[in-house]
Amino acid sequence: KVPNYSVGDSVIVTGTTSSYGGLLQYPNTSTITRSGKSESYKYPKAEEMDAATLNSWMKSPVVKYAKVSGKLKISGNYYNVEITGLNGQGSISYPMTGIVDPALNGKDVDINGYLIGVTGSSTKYANIMMTSICEKGGTMLTPIGVLATSAAGEHKAEGVVIAKYARGFLISDGTGKMLVYNSKGYDVEEGDVVAVDGKTSLYSGLMQFNSPKVTKLERTAKVSQPVAQELTAADFTSYVTAPYYAYVTYTGKLSITTNDKGATYYNIAIDGTSAQGSISFPLTGVVSPDLNGKTVTVTGYAFGQSSGKYLNTMITTIAEATPAKAKIAFRAGANVQPNASVLYRLEGT
């Protein structure tokens, strides 16, 4: 499943572990619940691993944040790394589509990421959960998930456009998400891979790029959205005091109003809380005026709060709610599917 978390999120994982690739792991039937997030997160210093140290590690693997260098070989959905002297190969495990530039195929690269086990029979593979990649000797970009908790300043990022609205878009590289804002919007589409260069600042409780330079790169990606987190009334109440980026769904009564300056607001009243959903600057035609006053189900990205009351939503779909959907939209303890990109923090025993 596509991850619905960012690095630095705190989560509670419940499940039965088993051994795979020489390491213990949780199965895809595990329950994961978000319990908070770090206000400032950085990866540890990457340990440089040459062929000798990797050979030793492969005999007795442990999770380790490392820097690995070698020749990248891309074949379909496989991203293997040939390392001279290694009794096997490196393998980038399930990177987000579009993040590894196909132009790097056949070139020497540097990779930062977590070593997460050894698989294979005739050929052994050291599996890497990649956080960044560049041509050998180049400059590693800071992962978006880290930028999202870093101090405001001048920053660069590359990632996939995963959603857009009239004033910008969300970008992701698999480690996290950030809003790229411009009051005039950008000529990009979902699935475009872009480079972003500009200033970041804290707004609506989350870090975002403000009117940066955006360059479309010569590749695109197929975007698959995560399983949406079903928000309860309690989730709304807590979100407006501690916002986070996530793909969400919720049900409530839509109110469309226009003020004397011509600004239109799309707010959704939620039973059981004074907090509300707010569809932020939807693209033309996405929200039908016929839905005004009706109970609707909204799905999209939560990306901050306004006035301590509104959960800002970059909408992907909206529809009149069926009675069955209205009943389940506020159930407690909705399960979020596990993923391969979150840094787990286990709570309890």
Locations of the language-model features?
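OB-fold single-stranded nucleic acid-binding module
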Residues: 1-349
